[in-house]
Amino acid sequence: MLDREGFRPNVGIILLNAHNEVFWGKRLREHSWQFPQGGIKYGETPMQAMYRELHEETGLLPEHVKIIGRTRDWLRYEVPDKFIKREVRGHYRGQKQIWFLLRMVGRDCDICLRATDHPEFDAWRWNEYWVPLDAVIEFKRDVYQLALTELSRFLRRPAQRTDKSRGPRAPRYPRVANGHAASEAPAAIDTSAVCSEVEPGANALDETPPRVSLRD
C-alpha cells in the first residue's frame, strides 16, 4: 500500500530497557543493523501495526512493554534506486513512518527472534540511545535523527549525545561470558530460546543494506 507520492505507511519502534539503552537488531543473514519497523496493513491503525510488528520482529507482547511516546507526524525517507527491487522501481519512493518509543517492562529472555515463520533479525543487542545514528545506513539517518531527537524528551533522564565526530561506541555495560567480564564483546547471539542474566553481544556494524521490497 503506497500513498499518492509513492511512500509506504510504516511504523518504527525504539525499544528502551531500564537504562535507556535501545534494542538494535541485525537483519537475518545480513550485516546491517536497524530498529524494528514494518508496514501498516490496510485497516490497521499505527498502534495496531506497532504491536504486530513488535511481536513479529522481537516476540514481545503488549504486556512486555509500555508506550512512552510517539512522533506527532509522519517522518519520511527516500530509498535510493539501487536498493529498490526492479519490479517496484518508479512506483515506490520510500517510507513514511510513525515512530513509537516503548519501555520494556519484561525481561531480556522475553525477546524471541523466532516468534514467526519469517524472522527479520537473527541477533540483537542493547546500545546507548544515540549510537544508531552512527551505525544506520545513510539514507535512514535523517529520520533516525528526527525520531530519536523528538522522542528523547520522554526519557526519564534526557539522553545527551556526545562525541559526535566519533564512530559507533561500545555499549555502556561490558558484555559477560561464563560469568566473567569479557575483554571483548562476543559474537552476536540469538537469545530466543534462553532465559539468563547474560546479555547478548554484538558483531561489528556494517552499513551494507539489503535491497528493499514493499514488505520491508
Swiss-Prot record:
The cofactors named for this UniProt entry are: a divalent metal cation
Segments carrying the region annotation (Disordered) are 159-188
Q: Phosphoprotein as a keyword?
A: no
Q: Which domain of life is it from?
A: Bacteria
Which InterPro entries does the entry link to?
Nudix_hydrolase (IPR020476), NUDIX_hydrolase-like_dom_sf (IPR015797), NUDIX_hydrolase_CS (IPR020084), NUDIX_hydrolase_dom (IPR000086), RppH (IPR022927)
User: Which family does this protein fall into?
Assistant: Belongs to the Nudix hydrolase family. RppH subfamily.
Q: Which NCBIfam families match?
A: PRK00714.1-2, PRK00714.1-4, PRK00714.1-5
Name the chain's protein. RNA pyrophosphohydrolase
Provenance organism:
Burkholderia mallei (strain ATCC 23344)
Which gene codes for it?
A: rppH
